[in-house]
Amino acid sequence: MKRNEVNRNELSPMMKQYMEIKDNYEEEILFFRLGDFYELFFEDGILASRELELTLTGKNAGLKERIPMCGVPFHSVKPYLEKLVNKGYKVAICEQLEDPKSTKGMVKRGVVQVVSKGTLVDLEFLKEYDNNYIGSVLDFKTKYILTYADVSTGDFYVCELPYNQDKLLSEILNLNLKEVILADNSDTNLINVLKNNYGIGITINSEYLEDSYESIYKDIKDMYYLAGIKHLLYYLVIKELKDLSHIKEVKIVTKDNYLSMDVHTIRNLELFETLRLKERTYSLIWLLDKTKTAMGSRKLKYWLQNPLKDIETINSRYDQIEKLNNEFLIKESIRNDLFEVYDLERLCAKVICGSLNARDVLQIKNSLKVLPSIIDKVKSLNFNLNISDHNTLYNLLEKAINENPPLTLKEGFLIKEGYNEELDELRSIRSGGKEFISTLEASEKERTGIKNLRVGYNRIFGYYIEVSKGNIKDIDDSWGWERRQTLTNCERYITPLLKEKEALVLNAEEKIIELEYNLFLEVKEAIKKEIFSLKTTADEISKLDAIIALSVASEEYNLVRPELTTKNIVDIKEGRHPVVERVSKSTYISNDCVMDENTDTLLITGPNMSGKSTYMRQLAIIIIMAQMGSFVPAKSAILPVFDKIFTRIGASDDLVSGESTFMVEMLEARNAIVNATSHSLILFDELGRGTATYDGMSIAEAILEYISKNIKCKTLFSTHYHELTSLDQKFSNIKNVHVSALEENGNITFLHKIKDGAVDKSYGIHVARLAKMPDELLKRADEILKVYESESKVKKQEQFVFDLTPTKKEDSKIEQELEKIEPLQMTPIEAINKLYELKQLLKK
């Protein structure tokens, strides 16, 4: 049965209410609160039962047949929400907005929040070291405006991107946006690629939020930025019912201030996840992340995503790392303090979004507790950080919140004794009543002589005295007992005194829970008032944690401070790939990388498996680490500031489905060639291998020439086309280097050492031997190789002989005749005759 097929007039009042609410949330799965359960009906129920593996049942709704229904307990709803959201569904949470006990008739209900991939705020749903961004894209036909926010931290950004869909897509993937809001004029190809290739949630919306949250963008005047901001705000506030009071300001991201890296570069260099397993382990961020807080981990990732171009700011980070390296005891003491700091950024979001519980408040309090200690130590380091101690708020939380509060807010035991006089009095009443009831059982046993008498309690009948069937005869009417319930083996009684004490206890219990809840809301309001100050402190703590992490990494991995220069030189002595070195079981071989102002390109030849790709990645990683403000893995490093890095290393994912490997290779190469400047870095690994040999070699040579002649940026170009090594004779800015290997008695040892000059062997058959290819196959490969090498030598000799005896006589006659011709003074017939004469001369 489908929702749109039923006659609404026949539905029960509750189901009519459901239908009215569901009409406003057609795209969402509606969790409809009924008592202790969330229930799902019609298509939502069928879908949820399948996705969540729930039993699909039916519910009486006033119709002749039962409607499809399934449900989940309200107290354990989070795992179900997480499962649906991770599968790309949006969920609307409909709550009871009134207390059923105090309401006559239908309980008022309404949707209080919409949960989707991009707007999660519950910490247990989120990866602590990742931001959870939702974005908006507006297409202005000359440029894109990308606006993105992390509701869980209160970060909100806007930036302008060139009108290039690949660059837009690359930015969306780099930010790992979970949802994208697009206007209705958006390109359908972009929509399909985002949704189908990358599983990003897409919503089409062309509405803009006016006259709300203006304070967060009051200083922004650009009409394009404002449109992007209002577009995203409309979705968050109107569609998803988010309270964004924890967002202080929208930050404009100026892309030109940062080193640019497209999605291919970030993936090829394995900055955040490995190429093969798509895991964080063994990526660069895994190596560098020595942070103690979730906020610091996210900040470090942001620095790695956005390496700087301003030398002064970069050197400032170097100075802080040096200071920390010289103050080991202070650094370790701060790290111990940071370990006690919880995720203040996301806790602030929970304050605003209404999902804060007492344990969250306790985490805020425990975080604030260590701030004075951190502040004192930071002062001794002379770091310019704006960390407040929040002493007043800490004292309030220390006095108010119990050390072991319950998970939910309606269980009581939230507030400490001594915080509120009325609460203490109610607790005393409750305690006295419970104490009376606990002693009543003993006194009644003694008074009546009924040894198996007991005092019990249940929700329906309250407190009662229970007597077994065999002792009923001993009950005296003078005791004033009133029969309340008959069971198979016993009778239950109440007394006036018992009911009086019960009313006292239960009334006090109810008042205690209500008062504690209201006191907790007051505490939450006190936190709310300091929300922006807390967010500032959280941001400063994250910076401190991140820079300390880089200091720890510099000592653990023997990193050095690089020297940044305005000269166009790269001078790295004994450089290392930090991740490969860390996981390598053998001794890592370091290598120099030297390119003076007259050398733009290193043309790298050498055997397979010798380390060419690692050497290339190593340079890029050293540059990225240097520009994010980190020390680098080398004995010494002098580096310029780069504006962009482009890589084509190995197989890469296709942004637009359906392209061949070679086409993807060419598209990536074109991206580098078109967008690189003289201050960029290009890494091309065996370009041209995806097509026929001569085609590939021709393209590789043409690209190499183009870079050397037109772009003149620092480039590492590895190749197995040994014919290209002669280009250093044609272009003085190309230098040949090779990865050395030792050949002894038919065995090859890869030395992994970069040396000057070129080599003309790739040792492919040796690599096949290492791969345990069959001996018969290897023997045949050797035979074929010898034939090819022999033919190659003959061809070279033939070419040499041919070149020694050219006939230049006719050429010179032709040249002489051509010199005499005046094309503009010839008739068409004369021109044809002259062409015929030249052709005959050429035949001779």
Predicted regions and their residues:
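Charged catalytic and DNA/RNA-contacting regions of genome-maintenance
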Residues: 2-323, 332, 336-339, 343-349, ...
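ATPase nucleotide-binding head domains, primarily ABC-like/P-loop NTPase cores
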Residues: 42-43, 222, 226, 292, ...
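Short hinge/gating elements
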Residues: 59-70, 157, 213-219, 272, ...
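Active-site phosphate-binding and catalytic loops of NTP-dependent enzymes
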Residues: 94, 117-126, 243, 379-382, ...
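Amphipathic heptad-repeat alpha-helical coiled-coil/stalk segments that mediate oligomerization
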Residues: 207-212, 260, 271, 275, ...
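Short, small/acidic-rich helices and loops at N termini and domain boundaries
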Residues: 357, 837-841
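Charged, surface-exposed helical/loop "interaction arms" that form contiguous linear patches used
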Residues: 357, 367-370, 417-418, 444-452, ...
